[in-house]
Amino acid sequence: MTHQRHRREVVARLLRARRIGTQEELLEALRAGGIEATQATLSRDLAQLGARRVSRPEGGTVYELPAGAAERDGLATLRGLVSEVASNASLVVIRTHPGSAPAIARAIDLAGLPDVLGTIAGDDTIFVAPAGELRARKLATRLADLLGAPVAGEGPAQ
């Protein structure tokens, strides 16, 4: 896992676990966990995660992750169970360890990814139908990144 990905996962966990209202509070929490970051880096991380500040009824604001963020993080917990992600012009195929496909397909469905129309899972293979006119190759690359798996013909995912 890259340092950037690890930091973003920690930021997401902190935002789900605590009421954090400022980037300074978040920087302090990261530093307490041994992670150094600049305000500019943290700002980019928050934007990448889709975090936004929302007003609280009792006053003040807190950072909040968009709906589905926890489910997308759930996909990351399934890393290591996916062997490969491949695609053709209209379909993405995910190859998994035996018995893992149903759980991974369910996690993809629960993640609420707007690029995914739906999934069908067997024992070790998942068919993923892209939504709309999205090219299957782009979706394959995105799923491979979320699941930490290589895209067929491209080598290991970063």
Curated annotation (Swiss-Prot):
It is found in: Cytoplasm. The keyword Amino-acid biosynthesis applies. GO terms for biological process: L-arginine biosynthetic process; protein complex oligomerization; regulation of arginine biosynthetic process. GO terms for molecular function: arginine binding; DNA binding; DNA-binding transcription factor activity. Its main location: cytoplasm. Regulates arginine biosynthesis genes. Belongs to the ArgR family. This is Arginine repressor.
